[in-house]
């Protein structure tokens, strides 16, 4: 095992640990969100916070995974029950795709911008995440639920029709979520900086500890 392989193994372990931690936080945060139904029948997506942090620290793929977990938690905790009553398949597709996509896009936005400025990259990822989440929700409503718009409006006692029904459902939560992410962005930056420094130190220690082992292995090969 050479130094490069050891380093790659260390980074892989770090990513695994961080993704497991962020997965746990997504589950906890979104379960807590069940009790934060401020606007309409939906809970607020506070699970987007660890999704952004995970996407920045671990990359777009882990961001997509965290978004998938977020979507599953939303469905399990009853956050999509209103739509399940009208179109089960459409609900599953919409919830899973919007969750995965918001984490994936947040990760790519961070990768694109971090070469210029880390703080700007994190803030941009935090803003893009709820935009993608809400945008795909509205797209899913158009594709799968437009025939039921008036029925949903009557059920929720909304004095609107057509696409305005779904816009009304999403608008309040969207403003809350994007505002929350913007306000918490500086905290996210600090958390990310601390996490990176911590794992960088551990990575250096692992690489340093591996050097004597590698030297001993090389000497053994030479003697043989």
Residue map of PLM features:
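Hydrophobic transmembrane alpha-helices
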Residues: 1-65
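Interfacial aromatic-anchored transmembrane helix boundaries in multi-pass membrane proteins
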Residues: 30-44, 68-104, 108
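Membrane-water interface at transmembrane helix exits
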Residues: 29-30, 34, 106, 110, ...
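Hydrophobic alpha-helical transmembrane segments
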Residues: 16-20, 49, 63-68, 92-97, ...
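Juxtamembrane non-transmembrane "cap" segments at the membrane-aqueous interface
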Residues: 132-157
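Alpha-helical transmembrane segments of multipass membrane proteins
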Residues: 26-30, 70, 74, 102, ...
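Alpha-helical transmembrane segments and their cytosolic interface
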Residues: 1-23, 156-224
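Internal alpha-helical transmembrane segments of multi-pass membrane proteins
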Residues: 112-135, 202-224
């Amino acid at each position: 095992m050479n130094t490069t392989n050891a380093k790659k193994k260390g980074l892989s372990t770090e990513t695994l640990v961080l993704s497991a931690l962020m997965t746990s936080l997504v589950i906890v945060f979104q379960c807590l969100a069940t009790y934060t139904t401020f606007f309409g029948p939906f809970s607020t997506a506070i699970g987007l916070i660890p999704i952004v942090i995970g996407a920045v620290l671990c990359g777009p793929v882990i961001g997509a995974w965290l978004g998938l977990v977020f979507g599953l938690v939303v469905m399990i905790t009853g956050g999509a029950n209103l739509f399940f009553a009208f179109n089960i398949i459409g609900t599953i597709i919409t919830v899973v795709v919007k969750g995965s996509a918001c984490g994936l896009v947040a990760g790519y936005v961070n990768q694109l911008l971090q070469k210029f400025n880390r703080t700007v990259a994190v803030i941009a990822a935090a803003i893009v995440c709820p935009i993608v989440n809400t945008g795909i929700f509205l797209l899913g409503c158009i594709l799968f639920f437009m025939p039921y718009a008036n029925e949903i409006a009557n059920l929720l006692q909304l004095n609107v029709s057509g696409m305005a029904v779904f816009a009304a459902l999403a608008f309040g939560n969207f403003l809350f979520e994007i505002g929350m992410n913007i306000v918490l962005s500086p905290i996210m930056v600090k958390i990310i900086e601390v996490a990176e420094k911590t794992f960088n130190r551990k990575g250096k220690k692992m690489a340093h500890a591996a050097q004597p082992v590698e030297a001993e292995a090389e000497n053994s090969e030479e003697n043989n």
